[in-house]
A protein has these predicted regions:
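Glycine/Thr-rich beta-alpha phosphate-binding loop at enzyme active sites
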Residues: 16-70, 134-138, 173-231, 273-276
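Alpha-helix-loop-beta-strand connector modules within alpha/beta enzyme cores
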Residues: 58-82, 120-133, 220-238, 242-246
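Conserved, mostly hydrophobic/aromatic
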Residues: 9, 39, 47, 96, ...
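Short, well-ordered coil/turn segments that N-cap beta-strands
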Residues: 1-4, 44-46, 77-81, 101-102, ...
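C-terminal helical cap(s) of enzyme catalytic domains, especially alpha/beta-barrels
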Residues: 116-123, 253-258, 262-284
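Catalytic beta/alpha-barrel core
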Residues: 47-53, 80-89, 102-113, 131, ...
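Conserved anion-binding
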Residues: 10-23, 101-149, 153, 158-163, ...
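Catalytic cores of alpha/beta
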Residues: 81-102, 224-260, 276, 281
Length: 284
């Protein structure tokens, strides 16, 4: 089953309804706890909680994130939090885990020191996800047309699953054409393939994979990249970026049928624009 992780991005002490690819605030700020509760009350059992200021090197909301996690644990003890944004060291990971996060995303910028990253992987095991923010090595790939934004919700998802004309074999991507390029600070880290090989050898438990071109663009997930990368690792893979409607989620579920380690998808902008109805999708 593909887990749906609604994202709550926090900047300047407030949750922003969506953000630009450069991390800029693109919507009115609301209480971070209220934003989380909105998705929990819609049925979410995981929250992807992001410190945008830490991710883009302009401050920290760590104390607020810790308070939000504590409040969620008190109000909804069955909900888990995935902490993301600006995590680059053992101290960062320990702080997030001590605050009650179940999983912590290590930022792609940490991959500049691959030896240190593999040491963190071995130390924190299943509690650590490694972010792979990637872009094409030469020219950016053209985003695929998004799935038809037909009525959102369970009916749309079921219809997409029944009627989508999926190819028998999903198209593949050439991982050699991608580089790891963090969305926060700094330029490209290096080619994806050798980095992935080193992380696999270290025993990485999960990757969060984001195609930078699609992040926040509502242009559909990069299915060839996700399928090929899932086939190149035994680790869990969480898709991030581009999801625009329930049809995109159905396409990811189809892909997960042949790549069972593709286990989750982070939902962002489409939730806040109303293009995805989380409550309807999670309804039994």
């Amino acid at each position: 089953v593909l887990r749906l992780l609604p994202a709550v991005d926090v900047a300047n002490g407030l949750a922003v309804t969506h953000r630009t690819s450069a991390g800029g605030d693109a919507g009115a700020g609301i209480s971070a706890l209220d934003a989380c509760l909105r998705w929990v009350e819609a049925g979410a059992d995981w929250i992807h909680l992001v410190d945008l200021d830490a991710a883009f090197g302009r401050g920290s909301n760590a104390a607020l994130l810790a308070q939000v996690i504590a409040d969620l644990a008190r109000l909804h003890p069955g909900v888990s939090v995935q902490w993301s944004g600006g995590v680059s060291s053992a101290d960062d990971v320990e702080r997030a885990l001590a605050a009650g996060a179940k999983r912590v995303n290590l930022g792609a910028g940490a991959l500049k020191d691959l030896a240190a990253t593999t040491a963190l992987v071995r130390r924190f095991g299943r509690h650590l996800n490694v972010c792979l923010d990637v872009s094409a090595a030469s020219a950016a790939p053209s985003p695929a047309a998004p799935a038809d934004p037909a009525p959102s919700g369970a009916a749309q998802l079921a219809g997409a699953q029944r009627g989508a004309a999926q190819p028998a074999t999903q198209p593949s991507a050439d991982l050699a054409t991608y580089v790891v390029h963090p969305r926060g600070q700094g330029g490209p880290v290096g080619p994806l393939e050798p980095i992935l090989a080193a992380l696999n050898e270290a025993g990485t438990g999960a990757y969060v994979v984001t195609d930078r071109v699609r992040d926040g663009a509502l242009s559909g997930p990069n299915l060839p990249l996700l399928g090929t990368l899932s086939g190149a690792t035994s680790a869990q893979v969480i898709a991030s970026g581009g999801v625009s409607c329930a049809g995109d989620i159905a396409a990811l579920q189809d892909l997960a049928a042949s790549h069972p380690n593709l286990c989750g998808v982070i939902l962002g902008k489409a939730l806040y624009t109303g293009q995805i109805d989380l409550k309807a999708l999670l309804r039994p």
